[in-house]
Amino acid sequence: MNELLKSCVNGRTLNEIEAHSIMRDMMTGSLSAAEIGGLLSVLAYRGETAEEITGFVRAMREQAHTIDGPEHVVDTCGTGGDGSSTFNISTAAAIIASSAGAKIAKHGNRSVSSKSGSADVLEYLGVSIQTSPEETIKSIERRNMGFLYAPSYHSSMKHVAGARKDLAFRTVFNLLGPLSNPMKAKRQVIGVYSIEKAKLMARALEAFEPEHVLFVSSRDGLDELSITSPTDVIELKGGKTYEYTVEPGDVGLPLGRLRDIQVATPEESGRLIVDILKNRGPDSAVHIAAFNAGAALYVAEQAADLKEGVALALEAVAGGEALNQLERLKQKEEELYA
């Protein structure tokens, strides 16, 4: 058995160099499925440290196929695994925010621990998910949004896919994915299923010099800014860290209902997103999408604060820009400029 793995089993935490080493071994196929499963189980049981996450992220970024995107590009993504069965809120938020001026590099995958992953729902909506890096950059430059399909950029993840699936519970990879955007986005809105994990991720991300990042974790368990409860926020901006709580009323939104934002399939999620973009979905669904889109607009410097961002997002939905953006994203490049 790997010596570092043995030390983890015996209760010791890893320093950043050791964490980097063992993640590199995982990413290069040097560990067996049993060893990977053992490590992920130990970490899930005892909890990860910020230093371990920093080392893991550094190794994942080194193994990834990275690309350079436009300045101020924003990623909206979450850890998933909150078990709430909500529609793909961060995906809807990305479409709305990009229609209102933010440049979005949406990093995502098919579902691992939820009803529907961002790739699943975008595919249902008719948006191409497996574009080349060049096509993705062009889409962001011309349409303000591109999708970075995780397996295309993190091919080394194939070595851990089997173990993750077999374990069927949240692992450290739920935390690492949002910190490993292939476009090295320095601006992000990251939804996290618990504020404790958000604090860990924020401390780890500080090592990578972020420009403006919001970690959001709602008290009803969503890895989103919520319209059904207060949301705890950790904001990294200009080398400083701010912690605060935001409620729907703070940004001009009423409290909503969880059942109005829950779905059972990617198809149901897709249909609800279309209804939201048409401004005819349940108020709770429109509002939670706008709340999270507003956060992306704030991080993208398109809004002075969250409240202004939400107002701009609601305007984009009401004015039809968000629905038009979906149609643009569905078009092939040659159709768009024919």
Curated annotation (Swiss-Prot):
A cellular component annotation (GO) from this entry: cytosol
GO molecular function: anthranilate phosphoribosyltransferase activity; magnesium ion binding
Binding residues annotated for Mg(2+) 2, in chain numbering: D223, E224
Pathway: Amino-acid biosynthesis; L-tryptophan biosynthesis; L-tryptophan from chorismate: step 2/5
Residues the record lists as binding Mg(2+) 1: S90, E224
Listed SUPFAM superfamilies: Nucleoside phosphorylase/phosphoribosyltransferase catalytic domain, Nucleoside phosphorylase/phosphoribosyltransferase N-terminal domain
Cofactor(s) needed by this chain: Mg(2+)
Binding site for 5-phospho-alpha-D-ribose 1-diphosphate: 78, 81-82, 86, 88-91, 106-114, 118
EC primary class: transferase
Pfam families xref list: Glycos_trans_3N (PF02885), Glycos_transf_3 (PF00591)
Catalytic activity, EC: 2.4.2.18
Catalytic activity from the UniProt record: N-(5-phospho-beta-D-ribosyl)anthranilate + diphosphate = 5-phospho-alpha-D-ribose 1-diphosphate + anthranilate
Keyword entries, A-Z: Amino-acid biosynthesis, Aromatic amino acid biosynthesis, Glycosyltransferase, Magnesium, Metal-binding, Transferase, Tryptophan biosynthesis
Cofactor detail note: Binds 2 magnesium ions per monomer.
Statement: the UniProt record of this protein carries the keyword Amino-acid biosynthesis: yes
GO terms for biological process, alphabetical: L-tryptophan biosynthetic process
Record Gene3D superfamilies: Nucleoside phosphorylase/phosphoribosyltransferase catalytic domain, Transferase, Pyrimidine Nucleoside Phosphorylase, Chain C
Binding residues annotated for anthranilate 1, in chain numbering: G78, N109
PANTHER family assigned to the protein according to its UniProt record, in alphabetical order: ANTHRANILATE PHOSPHORIBOSYLTRANSFERASE
Role of this protein: Catalyzes the transfer of the phosphoribosyl group of 5-phosphorylribose-1-pyrophosphate (PRPP) to anthranilate to yield N-(5'-phosphoribosyl)-anthranilate (PRA).
Subunit structure comment from the entry: Homodimer.
Family the UniProt entry places it in: Belongs to the anthranilate phosphoribosyltransferase family.
Protein name: Anthranilate phosphoribosyltransferase
Natural source organism: Bacillus licheniformis (strain ATCC 14580 / DSM 13 / JCM 2505 / CCUG 7422 / NBRC 12200 / NCIMB 9375 / NCTC 10341 / NRRL NRS-1264 / Gibson 46)
Designated gene of the protein: trpD
